[in-house]
Amino acid sequence: MKDPSREIIQVNIEEELKSSYLDYSMSVIVGRALPDVRDGLKPVHRRILFAMYILNNDWNKAYKKSARIVGDVIGKYHPHGDSAVYDAIVRMAQKFSLRYMLIDGQGNFGSVDGDSAAAMRYTEVRMSKIAHELLNDLEKNTVEFLPNYDGTEYIPEILPAKIPNLLINGSSGIAVGMATNIPPHNLNEVINGCLAYIDNNDITLEELIKHIPGPDFPTAAIINGKSGIEEAYRTGKGKIYIRAQNQIEKNKKNKKESIVFNEIPYQVNKSRLIEKIAELVKEKRIDGITALRDESDKDGMRIVIEIKREAIAEVILNQLYSLTQLQISFGINMVALCQGQPKTLSLKEILKNFLSHRQEIIIRRSLFELNKVRNRIHILEGLNMALININAIIEIIKNSVNSIDAKKIIIQKNWKSEKINYLAKKHEYYFSEKQAQAILDLRLHKITNLEQEKIIMEHNDLIKKTKELKEILENPKKMFEVIKSELLSIQNNFSDKRRTKITENHSDINMEDLINQEDVVVTLSHSGYVKYQPLSDYNAQRRGGKGKSAAKIKEEDFIESLVIANTHDTILCFSSRGILYWMKVYQLPESSRHARGRPIVNLLPLSPKERITAILPVHKYQDNLNIFMTTAHGIVKKSSLSQFKKPRFAGIIAINLHANDELIGVALTDGNNNIMLFTQNGKVVQFLENSVRTMGRTASGVKGIKIKKNDKVVSLIVPKNKGSILIATKNGYGKRTKISDFPIKSRATQGVISIKITKKNGKIIGAIQVIEKDQIMMITDAGTLVRIRVSEVGVLKRNTQGVILIRTSKNEKVVALQKIVDPMIEKIDL
């Protein structure tokens, strides 16, 4: 008896997992999820069409039960699940799924509302007329055949595919580690593109797009903008926006308007779409809609949305596009199997591979036909020679014992003829076995003069056919003429008009049109929680008040930055690494005073140790403005605002920082300002902005102030002609000092005293420029906010410690200071 332990093979589990998972991945990629670039089909679709081909389930013959096709595919070619095969059949029979249906279905095959197809035992199918163009010439040895799972049947590795199916019907699928999503196109346009590529292999993408302007979906609708199309055609990846086709109708009786949709984006479920619109109306997220009806019937789609008389149709339309699937993004990812390997393909590469496939098919077909023609010519030569010597042939047959004896004599005899010199060299001719058999099979009526002429005519025609086939094989130009001829024939038989319209430029839904303009308080906590809330939530209080809670935060967290902005403003977010990110204020979470907000790392692509240290609201980009930056180590830098005009999701470098330094302040300047830098230990330096040259984004900057040990810059101020500087400290103290009290010094000096620092008032947390009518906000690390009129804060000399601005609790410290300017004061309740 064998010892089982001796038959166990020890393997490294890590290597086994790698190997097994790789095998599984390639099996899914090659054998299931991705289409082949040559015929545009996945294996299951290829097996279905081949099964129908073998069954003669042709477009002009009777329908067959879907279950019969499913059974043949599973039993003969591959043991799929029956539902997987039937689902593939259903999709190929849905006019809203495929631009050019490959299966003609009879029965219930589902709907655009998401209704399921009837069971396979009820529905019937046959190949569509255009599907035959995928299978034509299959019997002419044009492709390789592979054995099925048990070796009892053979199935084509690929279909001959006269039509560029990958482009005209598209494909989608998810493999392991990759996916494909190729949109459908118009057959007429794709063939025009193929013809243009044949005429000029070096055709540019711009010229190619004149023939193939973009996808053409079975559900029509509108492609919003061309830029995504061009990117996808160039690189194989891109994103387009598909928008529902609409029209605004006016009721003649009540003068009310209705928005009517006749076409919706590709693969959108109409029933769920209508439910979503109704839900938005119920939740009052869309206002102005009075009625919603689905009036679709056999003649076409029609979704009617009635709106209030005073409502603006364009505004509601924008809201619908923004909040529902009446506008969707379609991510194009043109991945297909190319020579058995998954590859992302450009439009030109897809056309090139399809036409290369057609070349190979025509070569194999021509060789097959040439061999067949030569065999037939060989037989005709024998028949022709036999008819010339018919009397001798008949005599041999009469005198032979049997057909075998007659064949042997005919083959061995040397036949002479002076009439047909091209058949016999030196007037000698020997019949082959095949010729001899054909002579014996010859019917008597074939020896008439008329039949002899027919044989000679057929022989001559086949000689011409041989020359044509040889020319196709030897002359690439002739071969491409054949390809073009076949493509033109398909174009004449199957082309139709484009359904999907394409707009010239992408028309983004302007979210700002849907957002009310209002002044808000934007806060950023030390732990990175960001939010905004209406400025009107806060009423002005007298100096020394306890204030309102600005944010509910954890004990270890506190508010670090606060700015006043408009909901339509852009927030420039400067990180500790000197990277600049962009956000619109309305993209931030709107929260109540008691809410924490949302982690900014969920809104911006920050690295693990990166945090936002400064935020700056920008209302409008102006070419004559600069961004002036300062770091905690006293380094300053000036860059043109225009360098930061184009947002990038990943952010851009704003300043190159030295080790252990961070960006703490930013300001907008015009190039002729004064600059003031305040340190936490009570120092300030004021210098001319023009002493700092304008630098590129990646520059490191120059020294702005000399920093002593344990000191750092906390505030950057660009002072105006009038007003004073309000300084606040950690323990709630503060004061105002006239700007004129701060002397202008040279850049990179130590500066002068700005406030007298004591244990009582604490170190400086911030400094701002104010005027008499201003108000300020102060926030503590406990999240308490107090709003104070500047007029209530006394004006003191530089070398003083200030007065109490906010009474803090034990261990509570002031962490942020922000000004509210006069125009905002007029809008709030004092």
UniProtKB/Swiss-Prot annotation:
Localisation: Cytoplasm
Keywords in alphabetical order: ATP-binding, Cytoplasm, DNA-binding, Isomerase, Nucleotide-binding, Topoisomerase
Domain of life: Bacteria
InterPro entries: GyrA (IPR005743), GyrA/parC_rep (IPR006691), Gyrase/topoIV_suA_C (IPR035516), Topo_IIA-like_dom_sf (IPR013760), Topo_IIA_A/C_ab (IPR013758), Topo_IIA_A_a_sf (IPR013757), Topo_IIA_dom_A (IPR002205), Type_II_DNA_Topoisomerases (IPR050220)
Family matches, as SUPFAM superfamilies: GyrA/ParC C-terminal domain-like, Type II DNA topoisomerase
GO biological process: DNA topological change; DNA-templated DNA replication
Record has Isomerase as a keyword: yes
UniProt domain Topo IIA-type catalytic: residue ranges: 34-514
Catalysed transformations (reactions): ATP-dependent breakage, passage and rejoining of double-stranded DNA
GO molecular function: ATP binding; DNA binding; DNA negative supercoiling activity
UniProt motif (GyrA-box) ranges: 541-547
N-terminal signal peptide: none
Protein EC: 5.6.2.2
Keyword Transmembrane helix: no
Catalytic residues in the record: Y122
Record Pfam families: DNA_gyraseA_C (PF03989), DNA_topoisoIV (PF00521)
GO cellular component: chromosome; cytoplasm; DNA topoisomerase type II (double strand cut, ATP-hydrolyzing) complex
Chain's role: A type II topoisomerase that negatively supercoils closed circular double-stranded (ds) DNA in an ATP-dependent manner to modulate DNA topology and maintain chromosomes in an underwound state. Negative supercoiling favors strand separation, and DNA replication, transcription, recombination and repair, all of which involve strand separation. Also able to catalyze the interconversion of other topological isomers of dsDNA rings, including catenanes and knotted rings. Type II topoisomerases break and join 2 DNA strands simultaneously in an ATP-dependent manner.
Family designation: Belongs to the type II topoisomerase GyrA/ParC subunit family.
Subunit structure as annotated in this protein's UniProt entry: Heterotetramer, composed of two GyrA and two GyrB chains. In the heterotetramer, GyrA contains the active site tyrosine that forms a transient covalent intermediate with DNA, while GyrB binds cofactors and catalyzes ATP hydrolysis.
Other facts: Few gyrases are as efficient as E.coli at forming negative supercoils. Not all organisms have 2 type II topoisomerases; in organisms with a single type II topoisomerase this enzyme also has to decatenate newly replicated chromosomes.
Protein name: DNA gyrase subunit A
Organism: Buchnera aphidicola subsp. Acyrthosiphon pisum (strain APS)
